Each structure stands twice: as structure tokens, then as C-alpha cells.
Amino acid sequence: DPTGNEVLIKVKAASVNFPDLLMTQGKYQHKPELPFVLGMEGSGVIQKTGNIVKDLKEGDEVTFGSWGTGAFSEFIKVPEQGVKLKPKSLDFAQAASFQTAYLTAYVSLVRRGYLNKGESVLVHGATGGVGMAAVQLAKHLDSKVIATGTSLSKLEKTRDWGADHIVLTHKEDVVAFREEVKDLTEGRGADVIYDPVGGDVFDESIRCINWGGRLLIVGFASGRIPTAPVNMPLIKGFSIIGVRAGEYGRRDPVKGEENNQAIREIAETGAFKPYICKEFSIKE
């Protein structure tokens, strides 16, 4: 049974995130002791609450972040602060894919990127979870959205999410997109660049960012952590900004709660629709 501020949840759905894969390889910053159960986040129904839980009750439909592991299970105990009411506009599968991706996008574009209406946003890895969330949020904020990726067929889907333009990052196995981005932004470059990829994509990004632009470092899905020639941000007047959405909320709980509330309010407008490409039973 849950004690203190714990909440016992019957898991309805759990999502697979890139950090789950990294944890199995020992490459993620959070390194749980072996053995452990995978699963960073999910959705479900509260079964019981601890004796000091205030804002949640039995029967509530919720999303949860399990502090790194444990979501791939039938039941899970999670501290109250990691549990939020499920947006009514989302089903359980969509809700299981909601928290990490959309919170990352919100903290990146709004809190750290200071995205303004009408600005151009270059979203790398746009066909992945955090990229999809960024495309949808940027469009909700009335920005010009340029989505990038390595598969043209997958990129076409991003138009449904709000992408105004799609750009392949690779041309014959060479990362080359700077000229296309400049053409789409009247030679200026993107005002905000959202980069969960790193590597060669980062190297090319610093060549197509606008004066005063914000390059948001979200992750390194390419496998290579890049280094930047610091004369570039000096000459072009842009900022390189690191984003850790979870840590942002832990260090400033008030703003963290505001962020969580904001993404739920936007979800209820219908602007956020997590795309589920495949579902598996827990036995699989």
C-alpha cells in the first residue's frame, strides 16, 4: 500500500522514450541499480493514496512520471508530485506519451527559447516524440515551423501536426540543410532551433541561425555530443541554451507546476495530439 505522499496507480499505458534505450545501455545520466523495470512515464487510474496526499484521490485518471523507471508494470507507486490529472482530450495511450515530450517542448520553446509569434522555428528530429511535440506547440504559438528529419515519407506526416515546410537533413549521406533553411527564411536563418539530435545536425545548425537566435540543446540522439567554435555565437549574436525540463521543475517547483498546467490547458484546446505509431501488450 502507498504511504506518505505516495500514490498507487493501476497502469493503463506506458510509453517508450529514447532515454529508456539509453538506460539499457548505461548511457543515460540517470543510472538505476540493476535489476530495474523500464518505463519513464505512463497513464492510469489511482487505486489508493498515502495518508498525506492532498490533491489526488482514488479513481482519478492520471499521467505520471515514475522518476526514471518502473512504468512497464501493472501497478506502480509514484510520489504525488510526479502525478498529474490526465487531459480529458487524450485517451490513455496518448496520455502515456504526453508528459515528457510536451513538457520538454514547452520548457524549450517558451521558458528557454522565448519564442515569439511569427518567428521561425527549425525543429530537428521532427518525426520523433519530442520533435512532434515541438512542431505542434510552435504552430499553436503562431510560429513558422520548419520540420527536419531523414525520411521524406515520415516528414510528410508532420504537415498534419502543423509544419509549414519540411526539409531533409541528409543529402546523399551528407548533412546539408543550411541553404534550404536560409531560402525559407529570406536569408536570415531560423530564429529558434530545437535540437534533440546533436552531432552533424548541430554543426550545420549554427550556420543557419538568425542574428539573436536561440539554439536549444535538447539531446544527442545522433550519438555524438558536438563542440561549438565559440566565435560563431560571438559573430552571429546567437545563444546556445541547454534544456532539461525535469530539472527545471525540480529547481523551481512553482514554475514547474505552471508548466504542467500550461501544457494541459493547451491539450484541452485540441492543439496537442500525440501520434501513436504502434501499441504492444505488456506481455509482448
Annotate each PLM feature.
Residues 127, 135:
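N-terminal Rossmann NAD(P)H-binding glycine-rich loop of SDR-like oxidoreductase domains
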Residues 149, 158, 200-272:
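Glycine-rich phosphate-binding loop and adjacent beta-alpha segment
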